[in-house]
UniProtKB/Swiss-Prot annotation:
Top-rank lineage group of the source organism: Eukaryota
Organism: Arabidopsis thaliana (Mouse-ear cress)
Family of the protein in this entry: Belongs to the serine rich endogenous peptide (SCOOP) phytocytokine family.
Span of the annotated motif SCOOP motif: 43-56
Quaternary organization: Interacts with MIK2 (via extracellular leucine-rich repeat domain); this interaction triggers the formation of complex between MIK2 and the BAK1/SERK3 and SERK4 coreceptors, and subsequent BAK1 activation by phosphorylation.
Entry's localization field: Cell membrane; Secreted, Extracellular space, Apoplast
Region (Disordered): 49-80
Major localization class: membrane
Encoding gene, per UniProt annotation: STMP7
Keywords on record: Apoplast, Cell membrane, Cleavage on pair of basic residues, Membrane, Secreted, Signal
Protein name per the record: Precursor of secreted transmembrane peptide 7
């Protein structure tokens, strides 16, 4: 009787581990209705970056204003 209970417990734990691994390895696919890629592939979710203009609730440290490179005129504007 005791071995049957332990076998059931091992089977349950193994199935839970497989389920957790499967769910954690999935990639979030964003269903985009307004924008589609040219080749028709779905847009894959990527984590937000800490670049200029990006914000996230867990970022509490403020490093000051964004430093962006100065704007330069395109070559067509410089021609006479």
């Amino acid at each position: 009787m005791g071995s049957k209970t332990s076998t059931n417990m091992v089977a349950l734990l193994l199935s839970l581990l497989i389920l957790i691994f499967t769910l954690s390895s999935q990639v979030k696919v964003v269903e985009a209705t307004s924008r589609k890629l040219a080749n028709g592939r779905p847009i894959v979710w990527t984590p937000a970056s800490r670049s200029c203009g990006a914000s996230h609730a867990s970022w509490k440290k403020n490093n000051g204003p964004c430093k962006r490179p100065p704007r330069t005129a395109p070559a067509s504007y410089n021609s006479p």
